[in-house]
Amino acid sequence: MTDISNPIQFWLNGALQAHSGRADETLLGYLRHSGRVGTKEGCASGDCGACTVLVQTDDEHAYKPMNACILPVQQLHGQAVITVEGLPSNDVLHPAQAALIETHGAQCGFCTPGFVMALAGWMDEQAFSAGPDGGGQPEADSPQAETRRLKACREAISGNLCRCTGYRPILQAATHLASRPTRALFETHQRLDKALFNSQPDHSAPYKTGFRAPQTLNDLKDLLRQQPSANLIAGGTDLMLEVTQKQGRFDQLISLARVPALRSLQISSDSAIIGSAVTYQDLQAAAELHWPALHHFLSRLGSPQIRNRGTVGGNLGTASPIGDLLPILLAMDATIVMSHFEAADQNVAISEFLQGYRKTQLQPGNFIKEVQVTGLQDFLRYYKISKRQEDDIAAVSVAVRLKLDADQITLARIAFGGVAEQALRLPALEQALQGQAITEALMTALHQQVLIALNPISDVRASRDYRREMAANLLVRALKEALGLPMPQIYGLDDA
């Protein structure tokens, strides 16, 4: 038996749903099997955006665009979901729908619902941020405001990849929307039910019922004590690919998404404590003031749909050699706090936590509690090179952290992703930099040393030689920026 003992309940287009299904059933599967076929399946991996829906995960935030193809329906208990069928209010089209009609932005039509939902989510965020008295009014017109609106429009649909018959009308629709006031969706649609959200389905049956969503650390540890080998899920942006791409099954899943201690986030002027279930989106918003290098970089991680779901702990736990956060956390000498159901918390340096290709120190019964980082006031540069600007996997990534006394380096941390079986640092290179002044001769020597030290593979994303050259060039670029030298602007590095 893999069904939960009592159905979960969630709001779908204003109607309360009660559903009992597999632990790993996706929202997209649920929608299409129940006849709501406006939400399309394109890639089944969270890349194309055709399956975009809006989800209100708590009553303190707007509806957020998410990929239904990799979203477990069991995680929606108490939440509110809107699909393209439910977007109109009182039979009046939502402005995003109307704008695409007016500009002839439907392309072939298959991916249009995803574009509509992404734009509607962006509009809702603007209206929600304005508050009840703001009326969702757009920013006053000016050339600078127009530039910002256009950039925001492009960002809103960066997770919708279809370009089949003409992209410009879609951009025109988006820019039209940027100048229109709108009302927050919670004013016209069903909003999250707080009491239902805080409730739990009845789990009086044995644990084999499949899906659990503990709400405290103690409850999480109790579940792990019963089933230490159960699969843990937070955002599921990587784990659910085992289901959608490899036809795997997860009969037992424990969700970390509702444990407040794992969603905790503190960033001060020089340090950060990041709960493992903190989403990329929440981290990006919090990092803007004290960790601008990370704030800038995170706009290159996935898409809005992915950033609304993916988590810091998930990026760490999968230990992918191209995991976007791993070089950054290596360069920051991050400490990983691991918990266990029957042992005290354990602090582990990230350099020891990563054990090889998709291997970590995590053992059955373990989970990542939080990540601790210091050095936010140091000189920081994070780079990612990929074939697409948005929503793409890195071919190579570089993270550089320097402590400087004038132009002399007193501490250096240099980390790379996409160049080996795991993200790595070059300690010998770092040691050689300490006490050195940044000179042209030093940068030339470092460039050569990186070429010698790295031995990446060639694959569909990049050749071995390209990866080596790019890694070396980006390190030199960081050192030149540390000197304050003017650098040419590079699309994807400087305009995120």
Where are these regions (language model features)?
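C-terminal structural segment of proteins
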Residues: W11, L54-D58, P65-A68, P95-G105, ...
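Short, structural beta-strand-to-alpha-helix junction motif
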Residues: D24-L28, T52, P72, T279, ...
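A basic, amphipathic helix-loop patch mediating RNA/tRNA/ribosome contacts
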Residues: R22-V53
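Eukaryote-biased recognition of intrinsically disordered, low-complexity regulatory segments
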Residues: T2-A15
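Short, contiguous acidic and Ser/Thr-rich linear segments
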Residues: A15-A23
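Cysteine-centered iron-sulfur cluster-binding motifs in ferredoxin-type domains/subunits
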Residues: S20, K40-G49, H104-G114, S158-R168
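NAD(P)H dinucleotide-binding glycine-rich loop of Rossmann-like/cofactor-binding domains
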Residues: G78, I82-T103
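S4-like RNA-binding module at protein N-termini
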Residues: V55-V84
